[in-house]
Design a protein with these regions (language model features):
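Secretory targeting and sorting signals
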Residues: 1-8
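Short alpha-helix boundary/capping motifs
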Residues: 4, 61-63, 80, 141
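Alpha-helical and His/Cys-centered functional microenvironments
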Residues: 11, 27, 116
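Short amphipathic alpha-helical segments at helix-loop
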Residues: 14-15, 40, 84
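Short, well-ordered surface patches within globular domains
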Residues: 18-76, 120, 124, 131
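A well-ordered secondary-structure block
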Residues: 74-144
Length: 144
């Protein structure tokens, strides 16, 4: 599923530590959404995070916003290439400046919301990567 973008605002260069902090906050916020609706909190999975960060980095490097990635890969292929056997869904977004904005955007979109609130999913990996011009790209990969 894809989400649109918020209005772009000028940003300073973001470090990998800043991206990691953003990813952690997105994970926290989606777990608030899930647990408030009766689903278990998702566990962060390093393999799904690798797949998600890789796809976000590719989108940021190429300026492409798509579920289809490098070499026509999809989220299943990327997750399996990272060593995760049972991927369940993917959300992407771009342009949002805060974790709250991106999670709010996903929650307002029926398809993204369904992915986040799928109680059968047990794990998640989030990749937040900023392009050279400061545009953030997000990938959220879920697994069983």
């Amino acid at each position: 599923m894809t989400a649109g973008s918020a209005q772009a605002a000028p940003v300073k260069a973001v470090t990998k530590a800043g991206e990691t902090s953003l990813q952690t906050e997105i994970n926290r916020l989606i777990n608030v959404e899930r647990t408030s609706r009766g689903c278990a909190a998702l566990k962060t999975d390093a393999k799904l995070t690798t797949a998600a960060r890789g796809h976000s980095a590719w989108m940021a490097q190429t300026g492409t916003f798509s579920h289809t990635g490098r070499s026509n890969s999809n989220f299943v292929a990327r997750s399996k290439a990272a060593g995760y056997a049972k991927p369940s869904a993917e959300n992407i977004a771009w342009g949002y400046r805060t974790a709250k904005q991106v999670v709010d955007g996903w929650m307002k979109s029926p398809g993204h919301r369904t992915n986040i609130l799928n109680c059968k999913s047990t794990t998640v990996g989030v990749g937040a990567v900023f392009s050279a011009n400061g545009t953030p790209y997000y990938t959220q990969d879920f697994g069983y």
